[in-house]
């Protein structure tokens, strides 16, 4: 999820790709100050502090009535409709985009022109480096942010915010 690199005060974490194409963090031990922030934010090393359990399963189903958005989307267009509502409030939307080099990155932007890039599922690992830091900055400035990512990325964002809940 790359959250460890975002919270590292010494920027001493890089990522190496294994034979299967997955990224693994590499710590420059000479630069590391052993603050352990990387471990605290890691959803693997430090699992969720609280688990929300419901008595009954909570299931929702929906899709947009906007046929063009629904056709261009992979999940009924609900993400796009939520994002448009966020943009109308001059807030920020975060999500995955394809890059020119055929990789995928997480971004945060307040320009609705970027929505078609964010729309749709991306079936490969996305680079989140920098996005958690940027989201935290925007939240501290009082901005609203709508972030969409994989479960591990959402958990990493929550942990990088110090497990603080924002409305």
Descriptions of predicted regions:
Residues 30-31:
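Short, charged amphipathic alpha-helical surface segments
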